[in-house]
Amino acid sequence: MANKQDLIAKVAEATELTKKDSAAAVDAVFSAVSSYLAKGEKVQLIGFGNFEVRERAARKGRNPQTGEEIKIKASKVPAFKAGKALKDAVK
């Protein structure tokens, strides 16, 4: 499994940037995607995929410790849907 440091190293290798500059670039991309999602906007990267915010409806659940039925409030969650090129690359 690759982590953020692995991604930074890969970006540095591919772009000939320093690891420090690559880390700044990776952080900037993550920050930009987070910012758009926080405003409820979709981020579409052609060929790679789409980041979006999805609504989760209110629902009933159970407290696993007591078995008591509880109400779970509606919420918004970030979601990613892979694009065709990414799906094809993984096959």
Curated annotation (Swiss-Prot):
Identification of the protein by name: DNA-binding protein HU
State the protein's purpose: Histone-like DNA-binding protein which is capable of wrapping DNA to stabilize it, and thus to prevent its denaturation under extreme environmental conditions. Also seems to act as a fortuitous virulence factor in delayed sequelae by binding to heparan sulfate-proteoglycans in the extracellular matrix of target organs and acting as a nidus for in situ immune complex formation.
The keyword DNA-binding is annotated on this UniProt entry: yes
The UniProt entry, under InterPro entries, shows: Hist_DNA-bd, Histone-like_DNA-bd_CS, IHF-like_DNA-bd_dom_sf
Question: Which Gene3D superfamilies does the entry link to?
Answer: IHF-like DNA-binding proteins
Q: Which GO terms describe its molecular function?
A: DNA binding; structural constituent of chromatin
Keyword terms: DNA condensation, DNA-binding, Virulence
What is stated as this protein's family in its record?
Belongs to the bacterial histone-like protein family.
SUPFAM superfamilies, per database record: IHF-like DNA-binding proteins
Give the Pfam families listed for this entry.
Bac_DNA_binding (PF00216)
A cellular component annotation (GO) from this entry: cytosol
GO BP of this protein: chromosome condensation
